[in-house]
């Protein structure tokens, strides 16, 4: 048990500081923005300090644990803790949220509410990744919905209410299955419910019941990841959301679903995961091909990047369901890698829209000459997205490939077939990304526009872009930085699988 409540502070600080925003004057947009950035940076620095000094990389057990009695009526504890699986997503959350807050500079309408919602999301995300209690996990999962819905409905495009409603219907509807699964596990074979992850991991269930639990959790996580065919909310949401919200959606929110698949479906329900993993690998391979092909046909820039996110999450699904050391480590690396790259692409698409007020690719052309800095950053990060060697995406996808090839669960021919289909997906990725760059940056369409003079990237845009690019290159050169966080935890998870 940790003597100092680091994790409780990390969960409570952003939302508590967010409430103070409403004390600020209505017209203090600049003060509110810098106050929010200060809180985000302070949180990130505190997390970096605490994890550097108190987290042991070679210990696969839960660390920095905190457990406080919350509700006596049914023995509910505020139970937090982190391990190698949650450490990476927590640091990613702090990094991306800080940059998304800095990216939200153009927001002036209802600035106090906007920045409060950003901080509320921050707390919910940290709480979810550090939760060691099923009911607390569900509460943090739900805490995300209201801020995201309001951010979509109030700061977005013309169809923002439609996309926000679609988002809430999908995510809130699927959350019912998450709650049912959590309650089922808690009340099984006991008059006194226990939501503790550790207790649930050591519990055995009848096969049929475990499959039902697995399906319930899978539906909830498949919507958030997303996994086809439960992905249709994502392109509409990204297409209408402000780009700072898109950064949080692509960088963190989608990763919550993949994290839940590992933390609950794979770790708590290992027998059911063994049964479903073969089918989910097929779904993951189809998802890579389908989303990449669909992305090529999108005329809306943000929707093209959104389908790119769906395609890349297919690699995460394959890695998780390979039930191999390399595959699961590759999936975790892909979660971190795509968190950076996806957030960067949506940020750059938003800054481009701020300048040219165009979102359809067939209306663009010639941005390379008018805005060379944006062209340079967009090109580099697009190459990172298509897994260029030396970038983080390359090692993530490569390790997932090795993971499925070396998986002991599957026969040789299915592994070769899945690898071949997945490889086709990697060929489709440069097709839609390079086509996107050609339509945006080459040609002469913008030269003929009435206001043909456009401002290039400023210091703020360059800082955010470079800040995201640096970890993408660093992980691409030295991926052991991420692997060192997760390798011991992955071995502990796979010890439940006899063919691992």
From Swiss-Prot:
Membrane disposition: Multi-pass membrane protein
Gene Ontology annotations of biological process type: aerobic respiration; ATP synthesis coupled electron transport; electron transport coupled proton transport
Protein name: NAD(P)H-quinone oxidoreductase chain 4, chloroplastic
Protein family (similarity comment): Belongs to the complex I subunit 4 family.
Stretches assigned to coiled coil: none
Catalytic activity: a plastoquinone + NADH + (n+1) H(+)(in) = a plastoquinol + NAD(+) + n H(+)(out); a plastoquinone + NADPH + (n+1) H(+)(in) = a plastoquinol + NADP(+) + n H(+)(out)
Disulfide pattern: none
A single cellular component GO annotation: chloroplast thylakoid membrane
Subcellular location: Plastid, Chloroplast thylakoid membrane
Transmembrane segments: 4-24, 35-55, 84-104, 113-133, 134-154, 167-187, 211-231, 242-262, 272-292, 305-325, 330-350, 386-406, 416-436, 463-483
A Pfam cross-reference name: Proton_antipo_M
């Amino acid at each position: 048990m940790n003597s100092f409540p680091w994790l409780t502070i990390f969960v409570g600080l952003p939302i508590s500081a967010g409430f103070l925003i409403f004390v600020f004057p209505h017209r203090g947009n600049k003060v509110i923005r810098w106050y929010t950035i200060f809180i985000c940076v302070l949180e990130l620095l505190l997390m970096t300090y605490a994890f550097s000094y108190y987290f042991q990389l070679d210990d696969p057990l839960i660390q920095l644990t905190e457990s406080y009695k919350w509700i006596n009526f049914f023995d509910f504890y505020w139970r937090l803790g982190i391990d190698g699986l949650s450490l990476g997503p927590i640091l990613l959350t702090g990094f991306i949220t800080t940059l998304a807050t800095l990216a939200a500079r153009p927001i002036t309408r209802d600035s106090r509410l906007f920045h409060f919602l950003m901080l509320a999301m921050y707390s919910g995300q940290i709480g979810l990744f550090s939760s060691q209690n099923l009911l607390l996990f569900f509460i943090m999962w739900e805490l995300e919905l209201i801020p995201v819905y309001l951010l979509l409905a109030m700061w977005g495009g013309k169809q923002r209410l439609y996309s926000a409603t679609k988002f809430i219907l999908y995510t809130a509807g699927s959350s019912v299955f998450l709650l049912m699964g959590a309650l089922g596990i808690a009340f099984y074979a006991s008059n006194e419910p226990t939501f503790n992850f550790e207790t649930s991991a050591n519990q055995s269930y009848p096969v049929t019941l475990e499959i039902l639990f697995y399906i319930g959790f899978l539906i909830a996580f498949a919507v958030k990841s997303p996994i086809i065919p439960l992905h249709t909310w994502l392109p509409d949401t990204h297409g209408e959301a402000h780009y700072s919200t898109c950064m949080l959606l692509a960088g963190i929110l989608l990763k919550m679903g993949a994290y839940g698949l590992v933390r609950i479906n794979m770790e708590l329900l290992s027998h059911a995961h063994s049964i479903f993993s073969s089918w989910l690998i097929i779904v993951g391979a189809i998802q890579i091909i389908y989303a990449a092909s669909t992305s090529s046909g999108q005329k809306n820039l943000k929707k093209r990047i959104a389908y790119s996110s769906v395609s890349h999450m297919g690699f995460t699904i394959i890695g998780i369901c390979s039930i191999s050391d390399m595959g699961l480590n590759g999936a975790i690396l892909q979660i971190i890698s795509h968190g950076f790259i996806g957030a960067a692409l949506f940020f750059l698409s938003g800054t481009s829209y701020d300048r040219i007020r165009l979102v359809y690719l067939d209306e663009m052309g010639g941005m390379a000459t008018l805005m060379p800095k944006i062209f340079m950053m967009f090109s580099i990060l697009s190459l990172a997205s298509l897994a260029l060697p030396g970038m983080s995406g390359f090692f993530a996808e490569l390790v997932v490939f090795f993971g499925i090839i070396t998986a002991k669960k599957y026969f040789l021919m299915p592994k070769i077939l899945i690898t071949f289909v997945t490889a086709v997906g990697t060929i489709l990725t440069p097709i839609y990304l390079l086509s996107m760059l050609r339509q945006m940056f080459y040609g002469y369409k913008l030269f003929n526009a009435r206001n043909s003079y456009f401002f290039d990237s400023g210091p703020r845009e360059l800082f955010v872009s470079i800040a995201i690019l640096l970890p993408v290159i660093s992980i691409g050169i030295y991926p052991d930085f991420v692997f060192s966080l997760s390798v011991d935890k992955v071995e502990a998870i796979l010890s439940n699988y006899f063919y691992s």
